[in-house]
């Protein structure tokens, strides 16, 4: 009879574990969960595809949701034309309107914010997101693709645009290296506490 009881208890504990409940040995009571899983979103704008590649690395590693920002008026493909437009937008404080509804960000605790480096900071669509979305109390962590400027002023601009949000350490990756950057992205996510150590 004792053998049957122990076996039955083990089966019940295994089934309960599969159902998502952890049990304290010998008690049959659920163990308290120490930390609720944080809901994570990657919000990004990608002009050439480099930032999108990093966003997809993050999604593959974490299973998080993606929000690809789309300006109402797409940017020109020509590099020099985009650089000129980005400079004007930054100087004038212009925030390009987005096609995306932004109210869904309220469901998330941690938002990783990705952008190409334009004039040493976030691209216009990302500045629009940071300036208009309800981000108070969220944890915001930037990642930037670049060709030599690194993070630039993006971390400082993030704190300026979202003073009531918490911010984490950013990641800068050269655009020419994004395809092979998965391990670097994984290390960054672990350091930020977004993946198990």
Name each model-derived stretch.
Residues 1-19:
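N-terminal secretory signal peptides and thylakoid transit peptides that target proteins
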Residues 2-7, 35-41, 45-77, 84-197:
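FMN-binding flavodoxin-like domain, especially the glycine-rich phosphate-binding loop
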Residues 22-27:
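C-terminal segment of classical bacterial N-terminal signal peptides
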Residues 28-32:
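Boundary at the C-terminal end of the N-terminal hydrophobic targeting segment
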């Amino acid at each position: 009879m004792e053998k049957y009881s122990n076996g039955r208890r083990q089966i019940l504990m295994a089934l309960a574990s599969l159902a998502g409940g952890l049990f304290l040995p010998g008690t049959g009571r659920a163990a308290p969960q120490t930390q609720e899983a944080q809901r994570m979103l990657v919000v990004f704008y990608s002009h050439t595809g480099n930032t999108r590649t990093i966003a997809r690395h993050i999604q593959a590693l974490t299973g998080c949701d993606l929000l690809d920002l789309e300006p109402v008026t797409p940017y020109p493909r020509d590099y020099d034309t985009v650089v000129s437009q980005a400079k004007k937008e930054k100087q004038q404080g212009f925030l390009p309107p987005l096609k995306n509804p932004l109210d869904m960000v309220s469901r998330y605790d941690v938002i990783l914010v990705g952008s190409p480096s334009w004039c040493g900071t976030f691209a216009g669509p990302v500045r629009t997101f940071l300036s208009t979305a309800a981000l108070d109390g969220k944890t915001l962590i930037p990642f930037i693709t670049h060709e030599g400027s690194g993070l630039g002023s993006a971390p400082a601009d993030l704190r300026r645009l979202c003073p009531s949000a918490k911010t984490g350490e950013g990641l800068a990756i050269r655009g020419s290296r994004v395809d092979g950057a998965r391990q670097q992205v994984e290390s960054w996510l672990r350091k930020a506490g977004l993946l198990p150590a």
